[in-house]
Curated annotation (Swiss-Prot):
The keyword Nuclease does not apply. One of its GO terms (cellular component) is large ribosomal subunit. This is Large ribosomal subunit protein uL1. Binds directly to 23S rRNA. The L1 stalk is quite mobile in the ribosome, and is involved in E site tRNA release. One of its GO terms (molecular function) is tRNA binding. Part of the 50S ribosomal subunit.
């Protein structure tokens, strides 16, 4: 079934040259120009990778701190006890707990964006894995959210850390800021995540690794990027 778009989207799409791969700075300027949302829309970069995600060693997952943040104030929870709980609180975690926090989530509470845990808490956190997992919020060592250094993890999460992972088709989509960001700051964030994805190239991948990359605002059309400008 063909998706129908409204007049505003169609007008925005008309300003994007089909089949053209834009230089990064030009693409950022265009995405800002054609955005028509009546709020400060998010900007996302999307990669299409030549990876076989059926193979464990070709599944990308990780985290990176964007130099200019995401423009979103993240609510961070930490599963920790004792001194580590105190460290998390001092670092600015919104909620810190142990079995009580697990019980809250089991009861349906999900008012947070990032969950962090110390390794010793993972047995308890596992009781809510079926709730957190599908939402991509389960603490994981690969994203730095299972750690003894809870202060750094909280600081990173609050300071603009984003996580990335391939879906089953080899796509990676990551928020890189807001339409209101200065063009240079958006471009710097995009370069940061692009460098991270490029460095994460699995050794088993043959031929072209990044097949396509584009950026778009929440409701706006995608603008293809020239990889050579990243």
């Amino acid at each position: 079934m063909t998706q129908k778009h409204g007049k505003k989207y169609t007008a925005a799409l008309a300003k994007v040259e089909a089949e053209k791969n834009y230089a990064l700075n030009d693409a950022v300027a265009l995405v800002k120009e054609i955005d028509y949302a009546n709020f400060d829309a998010s900007v996302e970069v999307a990669f299409k990778l030549n990876v076989d995600t059926r193979q464990a060693d070709q599944q990308l997952r990780g985290a990176v701190v964007l130099p200019n943040g995401t423009g979103k104030d993240k609510k961070v929870i930490v599963f920790a006890q004792g001194d580590k709980a105190k460290e998390a609180e001092a670092a600015g975690a919104d909620v810190v707990g142990a079995a009580d926090l697990v019980a809250q989530i089991q009861g349906g509470w999900m008012d947070f964006d990032t969950a962090i845990a110390t390794p010793d808490m993972m047995a308890q956190v596992g009781r809510v894995a079926r709730i957190l997992g599908p939402k991509g919020m389960m603490p994981n060592p690969k994203t730095g959210t299972v750690t003894m250094d809870v202060a750094k993890a909280v600081s990173d999460a609050k300071g603009g850390q984003v996580t990335y992972r391939t879906d089953r088709d080899g796509n990676v989509a990551v928020p890189v800021g807001r339409v209101s960001f200065e063009e240079g700051k958006l471009a710097e964030n995009i370069k940061t995540i692009a460098d991270t994805v490029l460095k994460a190239r699995p050794a088993a991948v043959k031929g072209t690794y990044v097949q396509h990359v584009s950026i778009a605002s929440t409701f706006g059309p995608a603008v293809a990027l020239d990889l050579n400008t990243l």
